[in-house]
Protein backbone atom coordinates (compact mmCIF):
# COMPACT_ATOMS: atom_id res chain seq x y z
CA UNK A 1 0.00 0.00 0.00
CA UNK A 2 1.40 3.37 -1.08
CA UNK A 3 0.09 6.65 0.22
CA UNK A 4 0.47 10.24 -0.94
CA UNK A 5 -0.13 12.90 1.73
CA UNK A 6 -0.92 16.40 0.40
CA UNK A 7 -1.07 19.67 2.31
CA UNK A 8 -1.29 23.41 1.65
CA UNK A 9 0.66 24.84 4.60
CA UNK A 10 -0.24 28.11 6.26
CA UNK A 11 2.20 31.01 6.44
CA UNK A 12 5.25 30.23 8.54
CA UNK A 13 4.45 33.14 10.87
CA UNK A 14 0.95 31.73 11.45
CA UNK A 15 1.43 27.98 11.84
CA UNK A 16 -1.85 26.36 12.81
CA UNK A 17 -2.95 23.06 14.26
CA UNK A 18 -3.44 21.65 10.77
CA UNK A 19 0.25 22.06 9.98
CA UNK A 20 1.23 20.36 13.24
CA UNK A 21 -1.17 17.46 12.66
CA UNK A 22 -0.04 17.00 9.05
CA UNK A 23 3.64 16.81 10.01
CA UNK A 24 3.01 14.52 12.96
CA UNK A 25 0.82 12.21 10.89
CA UNK A 26 3.30 12.11 8.02
CA UNK A 27 6.17 11.18 10.33
CA UNK A 28 4.11 8.52 12.11
CA UNK A 29 3.02 6.92 8.82
CA UNK A 30 6.59 6.88 7.52
CA UNK A 31 7.73 5.20 10.71
CA UNK A 32 4.97 2.60 10.56
CA UNK A 33 4.85 1.85 6.81
CA UNK A 34 8.37 2.83 5.75
CA UNK A 35 9.31 6.03 3.96
CA UNK A 36 9.42 4.12 0.66
CA UNK A 37 5.63 3.70 0.90
CA UNK A 38 4.66 7.18 2.08
CA UNK A 39 5.05 10.22 -0.17
CA UNK A 40 4.20 13.84 0.47
CA UNK A 41 3.47 16.91 -1.61
CA UNK A 42 3.22 20.26 0.11
CA UNK A 43 3.04 23.93 -0.79
CA UNK A 44 3.17 26.96 1.48
CA UNK A 45 1.16 30.16 1.68
CA UNK A 46 4.51 31.91 2.11
CA UNK A 47 4.75 31.69 -1.68
CA UNK A 48 1.41 33.24 -2.59
CA UNK A 49 1.43 35.60 -5.55
CA UNK A 50 -1.90 37.39 -5.18
CA UNK A 51 -2.15 38.38 -8.84
CA UNK A 52 -1.47 34.84 -10.11
CA UNK A 53 -3.79 33.40 -7.48
CA UNK A 54 -6.75 35.30 -8.94
CA UNK A 55 -6.41 33.14 -12.06
CA UNK A 56 -5.30 29.87 -10.46
CA UNK A 57 -7.61 29.62 -7.45
CA UNK A 58 -10.35 28.00 -9.55
CA UNK A 59 -8.30 25.02 -10.72
CA UNK A 60 -4.54 24.68 -10.54
CA UNK A 61 -3.37 22.97 -13.72
CA UNK A 62 0.18 23.02 -12.38
CA UNK A 63 -0.64 21.01 -9.26
CA UNK A 64 -3.00 18.74 -11.19
CA UNK A 65 -0.15 17.70 -13.48
CA UNK A 66 2.34 17.24 -10.64
CA UNK A 67 -0.04 15.06 -8.62
CA UNK A 68 -0.87 12.91 -11.65
CA UNK A 69 2.86 12.45 -12.28
CA UNK A 70 3.61 11.46 -8.66
CA UNK A 71 0.76 8.95 -8.61
CA UNK A 72 1.76 7.37 -11.90
CA UNK A 73 5.49 7.13 -11.12
CA UNK A 74 4.97 5.67 -7.63
CA UNK A 75 1.82 3.56 -8.07
CA UNK A 76 -0.01 5.47 -5.34
CA UNK A 77 -3.05 3.68 -3.91
CA UNK A 78 -4.48 6.37 -1.64
CA UNK A 79 -4.23 10.15 -1.82
CA UNK A 80 -4.91 11.81 1.53
CA UNK A 81 -5.42 15.57 1.38
CA UNK A 82 -5.28 17.80 4.44
CA UNK A 83 -5.65 21.48 3.44
CA UNK A 84 -6.08 22.32 -0.27
CA UNK A 85 -6.94 26.04 -0.15
CA UNK A 86 -5.98 28.38 -1.69
CA UNK A 87 -2.94 27.21 -3.70
CA UNK A 88 -3.60 23.54 -4.42
CA UNK A 89 -7.32 23.94 -5.18
CA UNK A 90 -9.64 20.93 -5.69
CA UNK A 91 -7.49 20.11 -8.72
CA UNK A 92 -5.67 17.71 -6.39
CA UNK A 93 -8.86 15.71 -5.84
CA UNK A 94 -9.50 15.44 -9.58
CA UNK A 95 -5.88 14.47 -10.25
CA UNK A 96 -6.16 11.62 -7.75
CA UNK A 97 -9.52 10.48 -9.10
CA UNK A 98 -8.41 10.63 -12.73
CA UNK A 99 -5.34 8.60 -11.76
CA UNK A 100 -7.57 5.87 -10.22
CA UNK A 101 -6.40 6.44 -6.64
CA UNK A 102 -8.76 6.49 -3.69
CA UNK A 103 -9.22 9.99 -2.27
CA UNK A 104 -9.50 10.96 1.39
CA UNK A 105 -9.84 14.49 2.76
CA UNK A 106 -9.48 15.46 6.44
CA UNK A 107 -11.93 18.18 7.47
CA UNK A 108 -9.74 20.31 9.70
CA UNK A 109 -12.29 23.13 9.49
CA UNK A 110 -15.72 23.95 8.05
CA UNK A 111 -14.53 25.82 4.95
CA UNK A 112 -16.64 23.69 2.60
CA UNK A 113 -19.62 25.54 4.11
CA UNK A 114 -18.11 28.78 5.46
CA UNK A 115 -15.26 30.78 3.96
CA UNK A 116 -13.91 31.66 7.40
CA UNK A 117 -13.75 27.94 8.13
CA UNK A 118 -15.11 28.29 11.65
CA UNK A 119 -18.87 28.95 11.37
CA UNK A 120 -18.41 32.01 13.55
CA UNK A 121 -18.62 35.75 12.91
CA UNK A 122 -17.09 38.45 15.11
CA UNK A 123 -19.78 40.51 16.81
CA UNK A 124 -22.43 37.94 15.88
CA UNK A 125 -21.37 34.58 17.30
CA UNK A 126 -22.00 31.10 15.87
CA UNK A 127 -23.10 31.64 12.26
CA UNK A 128 -24.36 29.13 9.68
CA UNK A 129 -26.04 31.61 7.33
CA UNK A 130 -23.89 30.60 4.33
CA UNK A 131 -23.78 26.89 5.13
CA UNK A 132 -26.93 25.84 3.28
CA UNK A 133 -26.37 28.07 0.25
CA UNK A 134 -24.26 27.59 -2.85
CA UNK A 135 -23.55 31.31 -2.88
CA UNK A 136 -24.13 33.83 -0.11
CA UNK A 137 -23.46 37.55 0.08
CA UNK A 138 -23.27 37.40 3.87
CA UNK A 139 -19.70 36.09 3.95
CA UNK A 140 -18.63 38.84 1.56
CA UNK A 141 -20.43 41.76 3.20
CA UNK A 142 -19.10 40.72 6.61
CA UNK A 143 -15.54 40.22 5.29
CA UNK A 144 -15.44 36.71 6.71
CA UNK A 145 -12.26 35.65 4.89
CA UNK A 146 -9.17 37.35 6.33
CA UNK A 147 -11.29 40.44 7.17
CA UNK A 148 -11.01 41.60 3.56
CA UNK A 149 -13.93 42.46 1.28
CA UNK A 150 -11.99 41.56 -1.89
CA UNK A 151 -10.53 38.33 -0.52
CA UNK A 152 -13.93 37.33 0.87
CA UNK A 153 -15.52 37.92 -2.55
CA UNK A 154 -12.90 35.79 -4.31
CA UNK A 155 -13.08 33.01 -1.70
CA UNK A 156 -16.89 32.91 -1.79
CA UNK A 157 -16.88 32.87 -5.58
CA UNK A 158 -14.25 30.12 -5.62
CA UNK A 159 -16.19 27.80 -3.32
CA UNK A 160 -19.36 28.49 -5.28
CA UNK A 161 -17.47 27.44 -8.42
CA UNK A 162 -16.12 24.31 -6.70
CA UNK A 163 -19.63 23.24 -5.71
CA UNK A 164 -21.21 24.00 -9.08
CA UNK A 165 -18.54 21.98 -10.88
CA UNK A 166 -18.84 19.04 -8.48
CA UNK A 167 -15.21 19.35 -7.38
CA UNK A 168 -15.84 17.65 -4.04
CA UNK A 169 -17.54 14.66 -5.68
CA UNK A 170 -14.02 13.43 -6.44
CA UNK A 171 -13.48 12.76 -2.73
CA UNK A 172 -14.29 9.19 -1.69
CA UNK A 173 -14.25 9.73 2.07
CA UNK A 174 -14.00 12.56 4.56
CA UNK A 175 -12.14 12.14 7.85
CA UNK A 176 -13.80 13.97 10.73
CA UNK A 177 -12.07 14.40 14.07
CA UNK A 178 -14.82 14.15 16.69
CA UNK A 179 -18.36 12.86 17.11
CA UNK A 180 -19.59 16.44 17.37
CA UNK A 181 -18.02 17.30 14.02
CA UNK A 182 -19.49 14.16 12.46
CA UNK A 183 -22.99 15.15 13.54
CA UNK A 184 -22.44 18.75 12.50
CA UNK A 185 -21.34 17.99 8.92
CA UNK A 186 -24.22 15.50 8.61
CA UNK A 187 -26.60 18.29 9.60
CA UNK A 188 -24.99 20.46 6.91
CA UNK A 189 -25.91 17.89 4.25
CA UNK A 190 -22.90 15.59 3.96
CA UNK A 191 -23.60 11.97 3.02
CA UNK A 192 -23.14 9.91 6.19
CA UNK A 193 -21.75 7.04 4.12
CA UNK A 194 -18.73 9.17 3.18
CA UNK A 195 -17.87 10.22 6.75
CA UNK A 196 -15.21 8.37 8.77
CA UNK A 197 -14.36 9.28 12.36
CA UNK A 198 -10.57 9.43 12.70
CA UNK A 199 -9.17 11.68 15.44
CA UNK A 200 -5.82 13.42 15.36
CA UNK A 201 -2.94 11.82 17.23
CA UNK A 202 -0.18 13.06 19.48
CA UNK A 203 3.36 12.13 20.40
CA UNK A 204 3.31 12.04 24.19
CA UNK A 205 6.39 12.37 26.35
CA UNK A 206 5.49 14.62 29.26
CA UNK A 207 6.18 14.09 32.95
CA UNK A 208 3.07 14.82 35.02
CA UNK A 209 5.08 14.96 38.27
CA UNK A 210 6.16 18.54 37.52
CA UNK A 211 4.99 21.06 40.12
CA UNK A 212 2.00 22.83 38.57
CA UNK A 213 0.65 26.31 39.19
CA UNK A 214 -1.28 29.10 37.48
CA UNK A 215 -3.60 28.98 34.44
CA UNK A 216 -2.63 28.97 30.78
CA UNK A 217 -4.31 30.07 27.56
CA UNK A 218 -2.85 28.92 24.24
CA UNK A 219 -4.26 30.18 20.95
CA UNK A 220 -4.67 33.07 18.57
CA UNK A 221 -5.68 36.37 20.12
CA UNK A 222 -8.98 36.97 18.38
CA UNK A 223 -12.63 37.24 19.36
CA UNK A 224 -13.66 33.77 18.16
CA UNK A 225 -11.14 32.16 20.51
CA UNK A 226 -12.83 33.73 23.54
CA UNK A 227 -9.79 35.67 24.71
CA UNK A 228 -11.79 38.91 25.14
CA UNK A 229 -14.29 37.23 27.44
CA UNK A 230 -11.49 35.53 29.36
CA UNK A 231 -9.59 38.76 29.99
CA UNK A 232 -12.74 40.59 31.08
CA UNK A 233 -13.18 37.86 33.70
CA UNK A 234 -9.52 37.93 34.73
CA UNK A 235 -9.63 41.67 35.22
CA UNK A 236 -12.01 41.03 38.15
CA UNK A 237 -9.78 38.47 39.88
CA UNK A 238 -7.30 39.29 42.60
CA UNK A 239 -3.61 38.71 41.95
CA UNK A 240 -3.46 35.14 43.23
CA UNK A 241 -5.13 34.09 39.96
CA UNK A 242 -2.25 34.15 37.47
CA UNK A 243 -2.92 33.75 33.73
CA UNK A 244 -0.19 33.09 31.16
CA UNK A 245 -1.23 33.83 27.59
CA UNK A 246 0.60 32.18 24.69
CA UNK A 247 -0.21 33.36 21.18
CA UNK A 248 -0.36 36.38 18.94
CA UNK A 249 -2.88 38.12 16.75
CA UNK A 250 -4.12 41.42 15.38
CA UNK A 251 -5.43 42.55 18.76
CA UNK A 252 -2.37 41.56 20.82
CA UNK A 253 -1.01 45.11 21.19
CA UNK A 254 -4.44 46.43 22.16
CA UNK A 255 -4.87 43.72 24.81
CA UNK A 256 -1.39 44.32 26.24
CA UNK A 257 -2.22 48.02 26.65
CA UNK A 258 -5.59 47.37 28.23
CA UNK A 259 -4.62 44.61 30.65
CA UNK A 260 -1.44 45.73 32.40
CA UNK A 261 -1.76 43.61 35.51
CA UNK A 262 0.95 41.54 37.21
CA UNK A 263 -1.25 38.44 37.15
CA UNK A 264 -1.84 38.62 33.36
CA UNK A 265 1.32 37.58 31.53
CA UNK A 266 1.52 37.90 27.74
CA UNK A 267 4.17 35.62 26.23
CA UNK A 268 3.37 36.34 22.58
CA UNK A 269 4.08 33.67 19.99
CA UNK A 270 6.25 30.90 21.36
CA UNK A 271 7.92 27.87 19.84
CA UNK A 272 6.14 24.56 20.24
CA UNK A 273 8.70 23.51 22.85
CA UNK A 274 8.27 26.73 24.85
CA UNK A 275 4.49 26.45 24.64
CA UNK A 276 4.43 22.89 25.94
CA UNK A 277 6.82 23.80 28.76
CA UNK A 278 4.39 26.52 29.86
CA UNK A 279 1.36 24.24 29.54
CA UNK A 280 2.94 21.30 31.35
CA UNK A 281 3.82 23.56 34.31
CA UNK A 282 0.31 25.03 34.49
CA UNK A 283 -2.36 23.82 36.86
CA UNK A 284 -5.13 24.23 34.26
CA UNK A 285 -5.42 24.98 30.56
CA UNK A 286 -8.26 27.34 29.64
CA UNK A 287 -10.08 26.68 26.37
CA UNK A 288 -12.73 29.42 26.06
CA UNK A 289 -13.19 29.27 22.27
CA UNK A 290 -16.59 30.57 21.14
CA UNK A 291 -16.78 28.52 17.94
CA UNK A 292 -17.34 24.79 17.54
CA UNK A 293 -13.71 23.86 16.77
CA UNK A 294 -13.07 20.58 14.93
CA UNK A 295 -10.66 18.93 17.32
CA UNK A 296 -8.84 19.99 20.46
CA UNK A 297 -5.12 19.52 19.94
CA UNK A 298 -4.11 21.85 22.78
CA UNK A 299 -6.63 20.08 25.03
CA UNK A 300 -5.06 16.69 24.34
CA UNK A 301 -1.54 18.05 24.68
CA UNK A 302 -2.40 19.54 28.06
CA UNK A 303 -4.14 16.41 29.29
CA UNK A 304 -1.20 14.26 28.21
CA UNK A 305 0.86 16.29 30.69
CA UNK A 306 -1.71 15.73 33.42
CA UNK A 307 -3.13 19.24 33.08
CA UNK A 308 -6.95 19.36 33.41
CA UNK A 309 -8.81 21.65 31.01
CA UNK A 310 -11.53 24.21 31.65
CA UNK A 311 -13.63 25.09 28.61
CA UNK A 312 -17.00 26.28 27.42
CA UNK A 313 -19.53 23.53 26.77
CA UNK A 314 -19.60 24.35 23.06
CA UNK A 315 -18.90 22.15 20.05
CA UNK A 316 -16.15 19.57 20.37
CA UNK A 317 -15.21 20.41 23.98
CA UNK A 318 -17.65 17.80 25.28
CA UNK A 319 -15.82 15.09 23.30
CA UNK A 320 -12.73 15.64 25.43
CA UNK A 321 -13.66 17.30 28.72
CA UNK A 322 -15.73 15.29 31.19
CA UNK A 323 -17.01 17.75 33.75
CA UNK A 324 -15.56 17.10 37.18
CA UNK A 325 -13.56 14.12 35.90
CA UNK A 326 -10.65 15.46 33.81
CA UNK A 327 -11.54 19.15 33.85
CA UNK A 328 -14.56 21.42 33.95
CA UNK A 329 -17.17 22.48 31.40
CA UNK A 330 -18.76 25.88 31.74
CA UNK A 331 -21.89 27.54 30.47
CA UNK A 332 -21.53 30.94 28.77
CA UNK A 333 -22.09 32.91 31.98
CA UNK A 334 -20.45 30.55 34.46
CA UNK A 335 -16.75 30.63 33.55
CA UNK A 336 -15.74 32.96 36.39
CA UNK A 337 -17.38 30.79 39.05
CA UNK A 338 -15.94 27.61 37.50
CA UNK A 339 -12.41 29.06 37.60
CA UNK A 340 -12.93 30.10 41.21
CA UNK A 341 -14.09 26.57 42.05
CA UNK A 342 -11.04 25.10 40.33
CA UNK A 343 -8.48 27.22 42.20
CA UNK A 344 -8.35 25.18 45.42
CA UNK A 345 -10.17 22.13 44.10
CA UNK A 346 -9.78 19.50 46.78
CA UNK A 347 -9.52 16.54 44.40
CA UNK A 348 -7.11 18.09 41.88
CA UNK A 349 -4.85 15.02 41.81
CA UNK A 350 -7.75 12.88 40.56
CA UNK A 351 -8.49 15.44 37.83
CA UNK A 352 -4.85 15.39 36.78
CA UNK A 353 -4.63 11.59 36.66
CA UNK A 354 -7.90 11.31 34.74
CA UNK A 355 -6.70 13.93 32.25
CA UNK A 356 -3.52 11.93 31.63
CA UNK A 357 -5.56 8.75 31.17
CA UNK A 358 -8.02 10.47 28.80
CA UNK A 359 -5.21 11.52 26.48
CA UNK A 360 -3.83 8.01 26.02
CA UNK A 361 -6.41 7.07 23.37
CA UNK A 362 -4.88 9.74 21.12
CA UNK A 363 -1.35 8.33 21.22
CA UNK A 364 0.31 8.16 17.82
CA UNK A 365 0.69 4.40 17.84
CA UNK A 366 -3.02 3.79 18.52
CA UNK A 367 -4.43 6.33 16.08
CA UNK A 368 -1.99 5.59 13.25
CA UNK A 369 -2.74 1.86 13.46
CA UNK A 370 -6.43 2.68 13.17
CA UNK A 371 -5.73 5.02 10.26
CA UNK A 372 -3.77 2.37 8.37
CA UNK A 373 -6.60 -0.10 8.96
CA UNK A 374 -9.06 2.45 7.52
CA UNK A 375 -6.84 2.88 4.45
CA UNK A 376 -6.82 -0.89 3.92
CA UNK A 377 -10.59 -1.12 4.29
CA UNK A 378 -11.05 1.68 1.76
CA UNK A 379 -8.85 -0.12 -0.76
CA UNK A 380 -10.70 -3.39 -0.17
CA UNK A 381 -14.10 -1.64 -0.39
CA UNK A 382 -15.02 -2.76 3.11
CA UNK A 383 -16.40 0.62 4.18
Question: PLM features: residue spans?
Answer:
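Conserved acidic donor-binding segment of nucleotide-sugar-dependent glycosyltransferases
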Residues: 323-333, 341-346
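A short, well-ordered alpha-helix in the C-terminal region of glycosyltransferases
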Residues: 347-362, 370-373
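Donor nucleotide-sugar binding/catalytic pocket of nucleotide-sugar-dependent glycosyltransferases
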Residues: 132-206, 267
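Nucleotide-activated donor-binding/catalytic signature segment of Leloir-type glycosyltransferases, i.e.
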Residues: 254-273
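Conserved donor-binding/catalytic core segment of Leloir-type glycosyltransferases
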Residues: 175, 200-202, 207-225, 231-235
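Short alpha-helical segment that forms part of, or immediately flanks, the ligand-binding pocket
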Residues: 276, 299-304, 318-319
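Acidic donor-binding loop of glycosyltransferase active sites
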Residues: 280-294, 307
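Short alpha-helical donor nucleotide-sugar binding micro-motif in glycosyltransferases
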Residues: 269-270, 278-282
Amino acid sequence: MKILIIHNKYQSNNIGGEDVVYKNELNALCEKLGSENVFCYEVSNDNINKFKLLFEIWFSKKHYKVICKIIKENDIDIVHVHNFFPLLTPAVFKAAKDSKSKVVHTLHNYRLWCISGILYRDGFGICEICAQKKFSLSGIVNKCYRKSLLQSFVAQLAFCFYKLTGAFNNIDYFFVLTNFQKNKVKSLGMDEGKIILKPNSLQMSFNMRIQKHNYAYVGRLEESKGILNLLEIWDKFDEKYILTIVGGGDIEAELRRKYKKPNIIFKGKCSREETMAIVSHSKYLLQPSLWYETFGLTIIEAMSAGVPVIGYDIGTRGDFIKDGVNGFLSGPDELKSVIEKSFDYIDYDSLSKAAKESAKQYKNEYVIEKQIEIYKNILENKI
